[in-house]
Amino acid sequence: QKGELDERDEKLIKYLIRHRHTSTLEHNLVTFRFCVPLFVRSQHHRHRTWSYNEISRRYTNVDICFYEPVAFRTQHKSNRQASNTEELINPKPHFSDVGASSLVKAHHGRCLHLFNGLIDAGVCREQARGVLPQNMYTEYYGTVNLNNLLKFIDLRTHEGAQWEIQKLAEACLEIATDLWPITVNAYREIRSKK
C-alpha cells in the first residue's frame, strides 16, 4: 500500500477515464448534506444511482424557510427547458402594483400561516404540509459513488439545466475536486475535449 499517487497513477487514471473504464470510480463514496428548494430536490432525485434520506415534515418542527428570488429569469428563446440567465426581471403582474419577488414572499407567508393554522387546529402534519409551496427548502442526505457523481455533474452543469440545480452541481464539483483532485480534473479535461 502506498499513500500518495504518483505520475504513473495519474497516467493510469487518465487512461481509464479516456477509455471509459470507470468501474474503478464506483468504490469511492461521498455523502452530502443538501438544503435546497423542493423543486431542486425533485430534479436531483431523478438521479436514481444516489441513495437519499430526506428530513420529513411529518416528524419535525424544523423551521420552514423558502427560496425567495429577488429577480426572475426570462424564458429562453429556443430551449423550452431553459431560462435566460442574462436577462433578470422583477415584473409586476397585471393584477398587482408590486413586483413578483414581493408577491412570492407574501404568498410564502400566507402558505406558512395556513400550514401553522391547520396544525394548531389539529390537522396532522402529513396533510397540512400539502399547502406548502415548491419553493420551501428541504434537507436531505445524498450518497453516491464518484462515477455517478461525475455523470450528475456533467448533466446538471450543462447550460440547458435549470440554474438552481447548476449551482448545486457546481458545489458538488468543488467538493469532489477537493476529495479527488487528480481524478476529477482528468475527467473534466477529457470530457472538455469531446
Please give the residue ranges for each predicted region.
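Family-specific signature for flavin-dependent thymidylate synthase
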Residues: 1-194
